A protein has these predicted regions:
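Conserved acidic residues
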Residues: 135
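Short catalytic micro-motifs in class I SAM-dependent methyltransferases
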Residues: 141-145
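A conserved beta-strand element that flanks and buttresses the S-adenosyl-L-methionine
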Residues: 138
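Phosphate-coordination loops involved in phosphoryl transfer and adenosine-cofactor binding
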Residues: 75
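Class I (Rossmann-like) S-adenosyl-L-methionine-dependent methyltransferase catalytic domain
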Residues: 1-70, 79-130, 146-157, 164-217
Length: 217
C-alpha cells in the first residue's frame, strides 16, 4: 500500500541533479563507489553520491512520525535493511527500541554511528537476514540496488518475520523522459522502474507492506 513519504528528498532540486549529471558524465566512477565505499559516502570531490555523510540528527522527526503511524511499541525490535551508517536506525535506539541493522558496505559499518558499533550486521546476500529476529523492517532507498529476485525475497522474508507490515522507501523517477538522468545519477541501481511500474511490481504484496516513493527526477 502506498503512503506518504516520511523522508524528504535530497536538498538538491531536480534541475541541480540534471546539471550535475551533464557535468560529471565524462568522469570515470571508481570501483570504490560501486562497492559503497569512501567515494560513495564521503568523497566531497564527487558531485554525486552523498558527498560527506555525517550524523546531524536529520532523521529524528522522521522516525518519530514512523513510530506514530505504525504504532510501534518499544517491545518491538526494529530492523533496517541497507542501513548505511545507521543514522535512521540510531533514532529508534535513542527512543529505547531494540535495533538491528543489515548493511553490505564494510566502509559504512566501520564508520557507523558510535552507538551502533555492535548492532549492524555485514551481509553479502539478502537471504542472510533469515538468521536474525526482528519485528518491524524499514528499507530506505535500497530496492533499486537489488535485482527483482532479491527484492521479492526480501519482501517475503520481511512479511514472514515482522509483526508489523514492513516499510519500503523507493527512489524513482516520475516519467520516462527522465529515465536516463535516473540511471546516471546512481549507477549502483540495477532495477529501474518509475512509480507506475513499481506499483504494478508490488501489487501482489499490496495489503502486506507499506511503501513510499522518493522522486529524484
Amino acid at each position: 500500500m502506498e503512503i506518504k513519504n516520511f523522508f524528504r528528498s535530497s536538498s538538491r532540486s531536480v534541475k541541480e541533479r540534471k546539471n550535475i549529471i551533464i557535468e560529471e558524465k565524462k568522469k570515470k566512477v571508481v570501483k570504490n563507489y560501486y562497492n559503497f565505499g569512501y567515494d560513495y559516502f564521503d568523497n566531497k570531490n564527487l558531485s554525486f553520491g552523498y558527498g560527506g555523510y555525517k550524523y546531524d540528527g536529520r532523521f529524528k522527526n522522521n522516525v518519530k512520525n514512523i513510530i506514530n503511524f505504525f504504532k510501534l511499541s518499544k517491545r518491538l525490535r526494529i530492523a533496517e535493511f541497507g542501513c548505511a551508517k545507521g543514522f535512521v536506525l540510531v533514532e529508534f535506539l535513542k527512543k529505547q527500541f531494540q535495533v538491528i541493522g543489515f548493511e553490505k558496505s564494510k566502509y559504512a559499518i566501520k564508520n557507523c554511528h558510535p552507538l551502533l558499533k555492535k548492532k549492524i550486521i555485514n551481509i553479502e546476500k539478502v537471504n542472510q537476514i533469515n538468521k536474525y529476529k526482528f519485528d518491524f523492517l524499514i528499507c530506505k532507498d535500497v530496492l533499486p540496488s537489488l535485482t527483482e529476485k532479491q527484492i521479492k525475497y526480501l519482501i517475503r522474508t520481511a512479511i514472514k518475520k515482522s509483526k508489523k507490515p514492513p516499510y519500503f522507501i523507493i527512489q524513482t523517477f516520475k516519467n520516462k523522459k527522465n529515465i536516463d538522468f535516473y540511471k546516471n545519477w546512481d549507477k549502483t541501481h540495477v532495477t529501474i522502474k518509475n512509480r507506475k511500474e513499481w506499483i504494478y511490481f508490488l501489487k501482489k504484496f499490496n495489503k502486506k507492506i507499506y511503501y513510499s516513493f522518493n522522486f529524484i527526477f
